[in-house]
Regions:
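N-terminal leader/targeting and accessory segments in enzymes
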Residues: 1-91, 351-353, 379-380, 384-394
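Phosphate-binding loop of NTP-binding sites
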Residues: 8, 88-221, 225-233, 426, ...
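Acidic, Mg2+-coordinating active-site environments of NTP-dependent enzymes
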Residues: 8, 67, 71-75, 182-328, ...
Length: 457
């Protein structure tokens, strides 16, 4: 974080007429990070209440503390009262963002946000100093933290925007003020909170609230909800598609090559290019198209963007291929929903190996759609060319039953991680491949921790 005047950073939070030019070089929510000249933001929590550390933060040199309410022992002149700590972070993040002028790409969507963010970063990073959202810092606390990482030498920023309720993307977009927006697709994640995919689409389109007049909005032309959505008139839609040559950017001759994909990219503005990406599945080709469209609409050269995409690296447990002895394991257990499950099974069906096995767990936060979604997953698994399916989790029991009913002969529903690992170890042989996918809360890496040591023997 670059140092900026307190009066600039606290504008909209401090009382009218507040004036203090002292430089602030850190905004923190962690009392252990407090240093002279910082601002400490107190968050109430289940285990700790940041308000309990406010007085100590001032003793250690904090210039100001942001509090939800007055705290005994904290001088009023050093306390900034904001009933909502998240709102305070967003206001300061927006104020800080306004002092600098990098080109910003904002990424949202139901599926593929993080991968598209990573691809966009890879596409842009070769053109100048670029930052991106780290980890899962895509909410009203994490996004301001990303803003605070912008410096005077930052030329580009790629910012992921997540949500679970309506209104959240609008607030994030107004903080980040992207120059280009991306909506990857409209799925069913958080449908329990929003009620319908139409409402999810409206929530994702809130990214337009942060886009200036004439800004490009990169949209999935293969998504029926985005296609029929009423787009704000102030944005300029840029459509990408797998196969539709009428789109602004499309992919033709899509094929899997080893652990990646190859395709012909057609750009109405720039012609045709042969592209390879080190990620499997047609859904990742769509993510690459979105990243390409955003980067080139910033004015970056297509050749350099494509070269960057070829160096893309997956993060975490997102379709990470692990060679376990003489078997391949595709770790895709960072998150899951019906759309990403379907895409993963389609990718895995084309994966070159002797036999295919899958360990699938619950998809969380589906509300009333959970039962039919898990049953449909079972039917999809039965058609995915699997030798055997192992499931784990209460909802995944529906998947196991549906797969059996659809004709998959070898199906095991495991009651714990050890049973899941044992079922796979008893069946798999050299040359086989395993797909592992579930929502993050199912922690399927614990089953893999029991599986891998035996494979290595």
């Amino acid at each position: 974080m670059e140092k900026i005047a307190a009066e600039l950073l606290l504008k909209g939070l401090a009382p009218e007429g507040f004036a203090d030019s002292q430089p602030i070089g850190l905004v923190t929510t962690d009392s252990r990070e407090v240093c002279p000249g910082c601002i400490f933001v107190a968050f109430p929590g289940e285990r700790f209440d940041g308000h309990d550390f406010a007085a100590k933060a001032l003793e250690e040199g904090a210039a100001y503390v942001v509090l939800n309410h007055p705290v005994e022992g904290v001088p009023a002149e050093q306390a900034v009262i904001s009933p909502d700590s998240y709102h305070a972070m967003m206001v300061m993040g927006a104020n800080y963002r306004g002092q600098f002028h990098p080109k910003v790409v904002g990424v949202t969507g139901s599926v593929g946000k993080t991968t598209t963010k990573q691809m966009t970063y890879a596409a842009i990073a070769g053109f100048g100093n670029t930052i991106k959202t780290e980890g899962n810092q895509n909410n009203e606390l994490g996004l301001p933290r990303t803003m605070f990482r912008i410096g005077r030498d930052t030329e580009y920023a790629v910012v992921e925007m997540g949500m679970s309720h309506a209104g959240e993307i609008e607030r994030l977009a107004k903080c980040a003020r992207p120059d280009v927006g991306i909506i990857t697709c409209i799925g069913v994640s958080h449908i329990g909170n929003l009620g319908s995919q139409e409402n999810i689409c409206k929530a994702k389109l809130e990214i337009c609230a942060g886009l200036a007049e004439g800004s490009p909005l990169v949209l999935n032309g293969d998504d029926p909800f985005l296609r029929k959505a009423a787009l704000p008139t102030h944005v300029r839609p840029v459509w990408f598609s797998l196969g539709d040559e009428n789109a602004d950017v499309c992919a033709l001759d899509v094929r899997q090559e080893g652990d990646g994909m190859a395709f012909t990219l057609c750009d109405k503005n720039a012609g045709r290019y042969e592209v390879t990406i080190p990620a499997m599945g047609r859904h990742n080709v769509a993510n690459a198209l979105a990243a390409y469209a955003a980067a080139t609409r910033l004015g970056l050269a297509p050749e350099g963007v494509i070269a960057g995409l070829a160096d893309f690296e997956q993060t975490g447990m997102r379709q990470k291929v692990v060679h376990a002895g003489s078997m391949d394991v595709i770790e895709d257990c960072y998150n899951a929903n019906p759309d990403s499950m379907k895409a993963a099974l389609a990718m895995f069906k084309e994966y070159p190996c002797k036999r295919r096995f899958a360990l699938l767990g619950d998809m969380l936060e589906l509300g009333g759609m959970s039962a039919p979604a898990h049953e449909e997953l079972g039917r999809q698994a039965a058609e995915a060319g699997l030798t055997a399916l192992v499931t784990y989790g209460p909802e995944a029991a529906r998947t196991a039953k549906a797969a059996k009913d659809a004709g998959l002969a070898d199906v095991v529903h495991a009651e714990d991680y050890q049973q899941a690992a044992d079922a796979l170890l008893a069946r798999m042989e050299p040359g086989d491949a395993l797909l592992v996918k579930a929502s993050r809360g199912m922690a399927l890496e614990k089953a893999l921790a029991l599986f891998y040591p035996v494979c290595a023997k």
